[in-house]
Amino acid sequence: PGRHRVRRFRPLQRCWVPCDDGYHRVFYRLEGELAEDDSVMTLRSFIDGEGEALVLEEIDELARHLVRLMPVLRLRDARFMRRIHNGTVPHSPQIEITARQLDFLSRELVSHPQNLSDGQIRQGLSAMVQLLEHYFAEQSSAQTRHRLMRRRSHDEQRSWRYLDIINRMIDKPGGRSHRVILLGLFATLLQAKGTVRLDRDARPLLLIEDPETRLHPIMLSVAWHLLNLLPLQRVTTTNSGELLSLTPVEQVCRLVRESTRVSAWRLGPGGMNAEESRRIAFHIRFNRASSLFARCWLLVEGETETWVINELARQCGHHFDAEGVKVIEFAQSGLKPLIKFARRMGIQWHVLVDGDEAGKKYAATVRGLLNNDRELERDHLTSLPALDMEHFMYRQGFDDVYHRVAQIPDNVPMNMRRVITKAIHRSSKPDLAIEVAMEAGRRGVDAVPTLLKKMFSRVLWLARGRAD
């Protein structure tokens, strides 16, 4: 609070909107309309907290000042940019000046006493330069790129390892001067490439497109940590579950393509309490980050259902991965946090529960979240008419599998529950589920229970509704 009064923001003083948290914010709206002659008309406005346009003169000049203060710097894979830009390479003397500036900045970092040798720190910085060259080489000719390649370290793995150490070193308290040096290094590379000329008051917004391209997951982690150290605002687009696992879910925004628009979904303020956030972080972010790309979650109680459901769906000709359906067990994290999270992130969901007491409680939780709406319940809940998946599949014609695993002769009478208990004792619930799934694979689609076929159709309908 109070930073809106500093010198560089004075031209925007009529645009500030006071907010409840004590901060002043600028809300800038940019609209585009396609005219009949296919030209685009751009409309600019500054708005208040209610979304109403402020009455201002010289809006274009204010917008230019805002862009000058907050320029967007776009990082993307240099391979794609080379197809667009050609013949705009800085002259060789400029490259030599850049090399001297980089050398000065690296010596500046070395001058601070650390546990690393000078050579190690220089090698770590060399890896950082490689990373930035990877994204900013779009204006390089083939000859220039070969010259840059010759300068790179021969031992790249060692360079990346040292860079990881430098990351952790700079991230310690009191590392502000080092961050400034890195930012200077970053700005030097930007200007040397001729990509942008930054105003001295600029605080750039870094737009990073698919940083996982051509980077091994370990190197991606190191590079992402480096970018986190730069005192800049960042917007990153990615298709990488590895990268999502490095990012708090509160900072993730899902983009969903719909028939007429692209919708953006995020948790927002007050989205989850501390306990729910911890469970989601462990269950989804750390262990199933790629599930954030799914269109629909099929929530099941445990590992048994995961094995059986995936195999039976495949027997019916449904490829869940291609359809954007992810089977997720919820017993460890709790059902309510997962549904709450899925709703806020724009992910469709369906729950499969057992018929025992625990399953009935889970079903009651789902009905409560749906306000006991029968129509919505049909879309989001399937209850097994049996104690659990083992009892259900036994009744659906797979009793011979359980007898075989339990090693019970056909002529020995024994009730269903004891057979299943013995089979689990001789194997395990997951292994027994795999046996049933393999037998279902041998029998074909006719062996799949009708209840599960209907559930598959409902889940795919939910997923496809979010697909187009």
Annotate each predicted stretch with a short phrase.
Residues 244-245, 250-358:
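RecA-like P-loop NTPase motor core
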